[in-house]
């Protein structure tokens, strides 16, 4: 069996991205949280998957993909924790629907409701639990820089900031894939630069710290 461990739902119907744009705009305007998400039909999901991800998988002989929301669209650097909880739940629900519609081809990996300047705590833990228990997810994407290229939150070895999340991952026996999202730093193009920066920065932070020694089998 050939398993692609890194796939994203990049072909959601347009109302999905439009909702996030409206949500961020409303938050920036008056600080309120837009919670009413748009309807997405099974036919729209099927139209986004069958001629795109699924067709490419069949062409290349891929049997199964670990499938998560669009990474650059996680958008943790915009909004706040409350907006990002709504956005993560909506995004994860769409991925779960893909996995239910095509169970032989896709297994879900979740988006966490991280936010710039907010340590990952109960809101993140709640979505972690929901993803595992209700949606059947087998892993999650973990953004090492929710500030979107500013890198102003603590590094991954910071015990007060990150270790409680690592401990939850170990307790649930699920892995997290380190994956940055969008960039609001004009020096860093999101995909061409920020993604590479993120991987390298996270790798070195793990390599030069005692995370694996202190947490044990840290699932990252």
Positions of PLM-derived features:
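Helix-coil boundary/capping segments in enzymes
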Residues: 1-219
